[in-house]
Design a protein with these regions (language model features):
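Edge beta-strands of extracellular beta-sandwich domains
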Residues: 147-160, 167
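Exposed regions on extracellular, virion, or secretory-pathway luminal proteins
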Residues: 14-17, 181, 185-186
Length: 186
């Protein structure tokens, strides 16, 4: 809970970058040096209103699982969402947990959601290697408002690489073919 004396806070720079005056890079941004969102980006995004707005930036309901599903990942699963409820499912036909946002408006508008003791890498390994059911191993978060699923996010463990997936990150802005434009390929 934030004390009554707290006036506000700020984030000095949103992107990781080379400082210029010091050899150590600045790693405190909500996006990395390639402008790819880090977990902090989604935590801040969850503080937005879930109402859709006609704006230049993303609006509306969101849910994001901040978990990598690796042998080194914690058992606790962290989820960021601005929805009233979040339902988390671990594996196909597996157990489901539900978080309901408290009615009181103290502190952050959308607190960080932690589902305790959910993930077990050995279950993942057993299903994938022994039972050959790697397609059934996942974490699925569903954001629910007024009893309806309005946002979803699914995370699957990384396997051996099969392909390279690239896309143009143009922020829905068309390129100009006069040679003066460039685009980031992610």
């Amino acid at each position: 809970r934030t004390p009554r004396q707290h006036v506000g806070g700020c984030l000095g720079h949103s992107f990781d970058h080379q400082r210029g005056y010091h050899p150590d890079p600045f790693y405190g941004g909500v996006m990395d040096v390639f402008r790819q969102p880090k977990y902090a980006y989604y935590m801040f995004k969850a503080q937005r209103s879930p109402e859709k707005q006609d704006r230049l930036f993303e609006t509306g309901p969101m849910v994001y699982i901040a978990h990598e599903m690796t042998p080194f990942s914690p058992k606790d699963v962290t989820v960021y969402s601005n929805c009233d409820e979040v339902r988390l499912t671990y594996n196909k036909g597996g157990k489901t947990w539900t978080y309901t946002k408290p009615a009181t408006k103290e502190g952050m508008p959308s607190p960080v959601i932690t589902f305790k003791d959910i993930y077990d890498f050995m279950i993942d390994k057993n299903m994938s290697m022994r039972k050959k059911k790697q397609d059934e191993v996942f974490l699925l978060a569903e954001g629910i408002i007024d009893g309806k699923v309005v946002a979803t996010h699914e995370v699957r463990p990384a396997r051996r690489p099969e392909k390279v997936l690239l896309w143009v990150d143009n922020e829905n802005t068309d390129l100009k073919a006069d040679g003066s434009d460039f685009v980031t390929v992610v």
